[in-house]
Amino acid sequence: MSDALTLPAEARERAGKGASRALRREGRVPAVIYGGKEEPTMIHVEEKLLIKQLMTGHFMNSIVEIEIGGKTVRTLPKDVALHPVSDRPEHADFFRLAKGGKIEVSVPVVFMNEEASPGLKKGGVLNVVRHELELVCENDKIPGEIEIDVTGKEVGDSIHISEITLPEGSESAITDRDFTIATLVAPSALKKAEGSEEEEDGEEVDADAVPATEQEGEDGDGEESKGDD
């Protein structure tokens, strides 16, 4: 998991659209902390700081420690609503991480040792089907990324979830199938060349070039010839 982020917050005393608009005019973003078998906690955070953390690129996959009222609450961002025109954050949801609990998260995959893949060396292309894996993880063991080794992979090979050794405390959220994460495919130029060869091999032969004995007794109209009665 990426290093935890710290986000100072203040309690939100009033709810409703009017109160939320007033907070936004003051440069604050209304938010809520929920989950963990506790009542939701309404808060508001500084807009500039929230934007800064969003710009890290890993905010939604980071533990965010929210400081409020002298306490620190470990959370995981679940949603940030943005204004449709300005893209400014309008509201944020944080899921409270209960001690000893588990949570479903999306964790990015990173492919390693591409230089050790014969297929990639020959010009093959890694076609990534899933850029993230849906995992069920222990709250204190959320991985920042999943490394996938492509050493020895040839063109035509596929990488399935069953091949991946997940970190301790993590398991796939999808358990009903051995889904594909990536495949190693031939470059488009090679595919086109192979396709042309297949077309040439499968071309129909001109009937005039076939000996009469091999034309199965069909006449010029394509009907089977019959002997005289």
From Swiss-Prot:
Residues 1-21, 187-229 are annotated as: Disordered. Part of the 50S ribosomal subunit; part of the 5S rRNA/L5/L18/L25 subcomplex. Contacts the 5S rRNA. Binds to the 5S rRNA independently of L5 and L18. It comes from the Bacteria. Transmembrane segments: none annotated. This is Large ribosomal subunit protein bL25. Residues 196-207 have a biased composition (Acidic residues). GO terms for molecular function: 5S rRNA binding; structural constituent of ribosome. InterPro entries: Rbsml_bL25/Gln-tRNA_synth_N (IPR020056), Ribosomal_bL25/Gln-tRNA_synth (IPR011035), Ribosomal_bL25_b-dom (IPR020057), Ribosomal_bL25_C (IPR037121), Ribosomal_bL25_long (IPR001021), Ribosomal_L25_dom (IPR029751), Ribosomal_uL5_bac-type (IPR020930). GO terms for biological process: translation. Belongs to the bacterial ribosomal protein bL25 family. CTC subfamily. GO terms for cellular component: cytosolic large ribosomal subunit. This is one of the proteins that binds to the 5S RNA in the ribosome where it forms part of the central protuberance. Keywords: Ribonucleoprotein, Ribosomal protein, RNA-binding, rRNA-binding. The gene is rplY.
